[in-house]
From Swiss-Prot:
The keyword Secreted does not apply. One of its GO terms (biological process) is translation. This is Large ribosomal subunit protein bL34. Belongs to the bacterial ribosomal protein bL34 family. Pfam families: Ribosomal_L34. The keyword RNA-binding does not apply. It comes from Limosilactobacillus reuteri (strain DSM 20016) (Lactobacillus reuteri). Residues 1-22, 30-44 have a biased composition (Basic residues). The gene is rpmH. Keywords: Ribonucleoprotein, Ribosomal protein. GO terms for cellular component: ribonucleoprotein complex; ribosome. Residues 1-44 are annotated as: Disordered. GO terms for molecular function: structural constituent of ribosome.
Amino acid sequence: MKRTFQPKKRHRARVHGFRKRMSTSNGRKVLARRRQKGRKVLSA
């Protein structure tokens, strides 16, 4: 059986990256919450 996680840098960035988060209002809310919480890394 193959593993379900087959990492790809481009896919990770495009789906969960900073620019993707900034492109929608809800994504910006995600970043705001993570800033408020004090996350060192905001997005992938």
